[in-house]
């Protein structure tokens, strides 16, 4: 919430720091109020600046919404394909936008306003492990109380006061590392990872040096393919993730 408020207040215009972290509310059970809770974060006067419509297949439209909305809900985040993650990562990091409006010949520089939040009905939802620090996965154990009214004025007044008093609105390196460790519970396991575990293990000091193999990535792949051809069918050693 501090990051969201700082983004709205444009408190970091000079250091190119954007709110690049999105909480993800995760539960395999439906009806716990995930999407409702996301909507409730916005006060009534800002409801029109909330959206659950975010199409990553249209990069220009997705970028424009960073300047048009205050909170973007990546609803059903687990349905986003791995091929969309690089674009989403870039959009989440964007601090300044160059957008060409309709009927205009040149682009205009617009401030980034939007922050992200998301929901998922699956726990194996993260496919980009190098970028997992950008997502703060929260596993829900019970329904969210969406009936008690949110005191938006008090909430945002407190956030504003803390920010103007110098409160940090981003995670440092140590905190990012903790987030990545926590997110290991939410990684999507791909078939070749399972095959690798079946075929190999890392050597230890107790192993006989004569039995320890030094293999290249290609050699590892060929052995995995030979051991489990049906699982590895259609895969190559250089497949782009």
Spell out what each predicted region is.
Residues 1-67:
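P-loop NTPase catalytic core of nucleic-acid-dependent motor ATPases
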Residues 62-67, 101-119:
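AAA+/SF3 P-loop NTPase mechanochemical coupling elements
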Residues 68-70, 112-115, 130-136:
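Short glycine-/polar-rich loops that comprise or flank the Walker A/P-loop
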Residues 69-92, 126-131:
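Conserved AAA+/SF3 P-loop NTPase catalytic/coupling segment centered on the Walker-B
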Residues 85-108:
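Conserved catalytic/switch belt of AAA+ P-loop NTPases
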Residues 126-145:
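A short helix-turn-beta junction within AAA+ P-loop NTPase domains corresponding to the substrate/partner-engaging
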Residues 148-185:
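Long, low-complexity, charged/polar intrinsically disordered regions in eukaryotic proteins
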Residues 170-241:
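DNA transaction DNA-binding modules
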């Amino acid at each position: 919430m501090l990051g969201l408020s700082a983004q709205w207040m444009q408190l970091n215009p000079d250091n190119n720091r954007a709110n690049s972290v999105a909480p993800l509310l995760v539960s395999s059970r439906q009806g716990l109020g995930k999407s409702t809770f996301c909507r409730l974060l916005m006060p009534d006067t800002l409801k029109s600046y909330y959206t659950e419509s975010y199409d990553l297949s249209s990069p220009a439209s997705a970028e424009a919404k960073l300047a048009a909305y205050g909170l973007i809900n990546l609803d059903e985040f687990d349905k986003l394909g791995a091929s969309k993650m690089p674009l989403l990562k870039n959009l989440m990091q964007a601090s300044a936008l160059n957008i060409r409006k309709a009927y205009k010949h040149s682009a205009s520089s617009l401030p980034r306003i939007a922050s992200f939040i998301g929901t998922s009905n699956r726990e194996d939802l993260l496919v980009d492990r190098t970028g997992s620090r950008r997502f703060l996965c929260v596993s829900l154990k019970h329904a969210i109380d969406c009936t008690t009214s949110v005191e938006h004025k008090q909430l945002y007044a407190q956030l504003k006061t803390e920010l103007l008093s110098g409160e940090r609105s981003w995670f440092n390196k140590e905190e990012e590392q903790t987030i990545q460790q926590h997110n290991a519970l939410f990684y999507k396991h791909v078939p070749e990872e399972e095959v690798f575990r079946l075929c190999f293990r890392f050597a230890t000091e107790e192993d006989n040096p004569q039995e320890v193999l030094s293999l290249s990535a290609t050699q590892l792949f060929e052995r995995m393919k030979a051991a489990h051809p049906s699982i590895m069918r259609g895969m190559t050693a250089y497949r782009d993730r």
